[in-house]
C-alpha cells in the first residue's frame, strides 16, 4: 500500500509537465542561454530574435532573420505545420510580435548577429523613426519568408 502515494505523485508530475509543455504562445528568448535552432550558436543580441511555433506546439528560436529564413529554406518543417512566426520588437527586446503585425527595416547599419540586418517594429511610427536613423529599405514578411 505504500507504493500507491508514489503512483499518485508520478501521475501528478506527468500531468503538470504535460500542461506546461502545451504552451502554444511565444517563449521568452534568453540571451546567452538559448541556442539558435538553425546555426546552433548561442543567441547573443535580444533585439533581433525570432521564433517559429508549430501546430504541435514545438518552438524553434533564432538569433536573426537570416537564420529564420535559412531554417525555412532547409525544409526542416513544412509551411503548413507552422502555427505562427514571431519576431522580437527591436525597441522592446523582450516582446515578440506576430509576423502579421510587424514592420521590417533592412539596413547594414543595424548589424544583426548573423548579418540579416533586419529589425522588426510593432508600429509604423516606430518603423519610421528607426528608418530616419538607419538608412535602409522596408521589407515584408513575404519578402523574407518564401
Which residues does each predicted region cover?
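The −1 position to Zn-ligating cysteines in a subset of zinc-ribbon hairpins
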Residues: 35
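Bacterial N-terminal signal peptides that target proteins for export
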Residues: 1-11
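Bacterial signal peptide processing site
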Residues: 23-25
